[in-house]
Amino acid sequence: MKHFRPRLSRRAFWVLCALLVCLRLALTGFQQAYIWVGGAPLDDELMFRAANHITAGQWLGAYDYLTLSKAMFFPVWLALLHVLHLPYLISGAALWCGAALLAAFAFSTLWRKKDPAQGRVLTLGLFAALAFLPSSWAAYTLRVYRDNIFPALCLYFFAGMAGMALRAVFTPERPLWPWLAAAGAGLACGYLDREDAGLFLLPFAAAATVIVAVVLAGKRRWKALAAQVIPYVMLGVGVLTFCTLNYTHYGVFALSDFSEGSFAAAMGAMMRVDTDNTAPYLSVPADAREKIYDAVPELEPLAYWLEEDAQLQNDFRDPNLDDYRAGSFYWAIRRAAQFEGIYADAKTADAYWQTVADKINAACDAGTLPNRTGRRVATSQPISAAYVPSTLAETWNGFWHVLGLRDCAPYETLRSIGTEDDFAAWSGYLHSGFNSAANAGEDTPYYSPYQKTVFAVMQGWTRVCSILLTVGVLCAVLCQLAELLPQRRQKCTAQTVVPWLLLFGIFGIALLRCAMIAFVEVSSFGIGTSTMYLATVHPLLVLYAFAGLLLYGRPRKTDKRRENA
């Protein structure tokens, strides 16, 4: 009896793709955005403010301590949607569907030997698995914040690099530049969307480029080899564009005056100063600050705000630790500097923080201030052996958090906060509604019976996906490792090695992202495992499980022949 093998014509494939996209967008249509006006000045409100300034032709607006504090591609995205009159949530879902479809086509080369009609079924299946991935509609996507689009931008990058690598090996007659351009767009936009993007996108890009370059050089495909610079050129153009705009408007040739430059140097210098405090999460504890105030007169005016001002301490100080967590201290000291007029303009702020950095470093080098590290230019905590156990434990927790698709509810349990004028302004600009209505007699958001029904279906799908993803990833790991066994090892050619390395790289970069977020969590934040920060990992594990099981999860014909013999 022949096995049932589903097949799809080209027309049926595209019709089903269109239907799946419509269904995915329809699900998002039941969702409502969430804001807390006055409660997120460093995040959602900063992005919304910048987007409005871009729309008004003022770039990021008047300079203050927040203007250049974060990567600012997301406000550009919001301004673009506003100009095109596109709804915010629907547009984010459409961007995700585009990334999912690109990723499905990128990996379709792996089933090139199948009948085309059968191959389309696999491509459609991978697209559906990614398009309806529950992390893509989780509550964090309902915020007006950069993580609404960051996972999609990263998926464009990974899909482009994977599509390029596989076609370089299996279909040398096809051009690589479209895939490299897609990877470059994802790399540039992702890098400009979050400051930490380069830490896990660039290692993957570098490894993929080197491996493919070896293959192309061996085949003397010099034009394809030269095209490998496309993603890096696009990244350079994007960075140069933003830096030029910042220099034109503020006199600072940088993407950010927070994560780079003199402020990062000042924070790195402050974290050099030794402390007797052993409490977790503290980068510059109170006893270290007292030593710094005495050694650096320029910081004395900020001492009042940091140590005495009730409002600033209420906003940033941790009452349980009675001090500033690392993830809050740098915002607190920047706001204190704002109150003292240091952020009157970018050049004044740059000169001030450079003076602070130079004096602290000089005092540490001279032994006037006790120090625990060498010179650093960073806003993150210094990596030390003390963080290794907790980071590994949190990496493990984060990995299982992703596999279990935890915290992927498609609605926000908190009600949006703001005045009627606030909601009118935000809704008018974003063309999206907010969950501002409350249940009778409660301060919880009201959702209609239709919304609740749809949300229940989406959560049911999440439970199914969590099981499939967990089993799929674990089986894919075992099957890929089994390929290293002598009895299954194939002849080492580009067609066997490159796919294996690609999947190994995807899984490895997923673990790297978990470890990155784990370190920040245990050293600075202490907010618990976050789906928002791990949302780039979910699609990578879907790709790994799907492609890994397809490549290595079935017995080969040669294996069957050996058994029969």
Q: What role is predicted for each listed range?
A:
Residues 36-42, 46-47, 235-387, 391:
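Juxtamembrane membrane-water interface segments immediately following transmembrane helices
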Residues 179-194, 235-242:
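Membrane-interface alpha helices of multi-pass inner-membrane proteins
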Residues 87-117, 156-160:
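Transmembrane-helix motifs of polytopic, lipid-linked glycan transferases
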Residues 30-50, 59-77:
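Extracytoplasmic catalytic/substrate-binding loops of multi-pass membrane glycan-assembly enzymes
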Residues 91-96, 129-161, 190-206, 534-536:
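Multi-pass, polyprenyl lipid-linked donor-dependent membrane glycosyltransferases
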Residues 68, 72-76, 83-101, 125:
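Loop-to-helix entry region of an early transmembrane alpha helix in multi-pass inner-membrane enzymes
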Residues 9-40, 131-133, 234-245, 510-514:
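Transmembrane signal-anchor helices characteristic of membrane glycosylation enzymes that use polyprenol
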Residues 1-29, 122-123, 226-227, 489-503, ...:
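Start-transfer (signal-anchor) and selected internal transmembrane alpha helices
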